[in-house]
A protein has these predicted regions:
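Active-site loop segments of alpha/beta catalytic cores
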Residues: 1-68, 72-315
Length: 315
């Protein structure tokens, strides 16, 4: 079995005699793990032609090395810095063995929680100019669909949609306002991406419970991050929607960042115990492994996963 097949088994919610697959939306510790860092925007400034292609090739090689070392089923190409660079990275990955993995990229043109400088202006506009906001949202959604189509045509099999809709105390808009200004466009984009043949993973942090049924009803294949920091219980989410959607994540990132190991173990084992049975679970953190998470803590989290059952990659 290839890593790709392992991931597909989980996305299809099929029971397997193995531990669940794993991956992270972002794994930013490659310098500590591999002695290689991902490219930054600054690396590509004023670089073109063969030199740019070489840098993108090094980027693709880092993705492959990390996926192999960490036994990921997915390789997610980060949103970076242009769509053409993403597509070129995907092509290089496909040429160098990336087809053994589920190639994944981002396309989510729905409103997300605005940053602090824009928040009040955004919510006032919903009241003062709703028709203009809806027209903008519709046009932006269509651009997201076109972006997703180009990624799929380049070889991406899984699209992530990572607009955050929720704070730790609930959605940033009421469910009714979410339906009007976000939900209809979220549904449109999910359905279009699936019509193009992609699997769709929806990510949002925070307390998703007031929106849970809405998020799943769109027809997504998987839901990430099942945020324990916001009090979301993966056992309850599994009970409510586990027959309709694959669940991803829920290992407490605060515990991964701060420790101790006993707390990391408790969170990891809770996820494996309550989300793995019956299939339809992908092991991972409740967000991403970002700079600042001690590598040894993340590797400990993975060691608990390795102990939880056999790997199809080793059979």
């Amino acid at each position: 079995m290839k890593p790709r097949d392992w991931g597909l088994t989980a996305l299809r919610r099929e029971v397997m005699p193995y531990r669940p697959p794993t991956f992270e939306l972002e794994m930013q510790l490659t310098e500590e793990l591999l002695g290689r860092r991902y490219l930054t925007l600054e690396d590509l400034q004023a670089v073109s032609g063969a030199e740019r292609h070489q840098l993108l090739t090094e980027r693709a090689e880092t993705y492959l090395l990390a996926a192999e070392r960490l036994q990921y089923a997915f390789i997610r190409v980060r949103f970076f810095p242009t769509l053409e660079d993403e597509i070129e990275t995907i092509r290089i990955l496909r040429q160098r063995g990336g087809e053994d993995y589920l190639l994944t990229a981002e396309a989510d043109n729905t409103f997300r929680i605005p940053d602090g400088n824009e928040y009040l202006q955004f919510v006032y506009s919903l009241k003062d100019w709703p028709d203009e906001v809806l027209e903008y949202a519709s046009n932006w959604c269509d651009k997201g669909i076109k972006r997703g189509k180009r990624l799929i045509d380049a070889g991406v099999e899984v699209i992530t949609m990572c607009a955050d809709y929720c704070f730790n105390n609930g959605p940033f808009l009421s469910p009714e306002m979410w339906d009007r200004f976000i939900g209809q466009f979220y549904y449109r984009q999910v359905r279009a991406l699936k019509d193009y043949g992609a699997y769709v993973i929806k990510h949002t942090d925070g307390d998703i419970m007031p929106l849970l049924e809405r998020l799943v009803d769109a027809g997504i294949d998987a839901l990430h991050s099942i945020d324990p920091i916001a009090g979301v219980d993966i056992a309850e989410v599994k009970r409510l929607v586990g027959d309709r959607v694959c669940l991803i994540g829920n290992v407490d990132l605060a515990k991964l960042q701060q420790g101790p190991l006993e707390d990391i173990e408790a969170s990891a084992r809770y996820c494996l115990e309550h989300a793995s049975p019956g299939g339809g679970y992908i092991y991972g953190s409740c967000n991403s492994i970002f700079e600042g998470v001690p590598l040894e803590n993340y590797m400990y989290m993975l060691s608990l996963w390795q102990e939880s059952g056999p790997s199809p990659l080793e059979s």
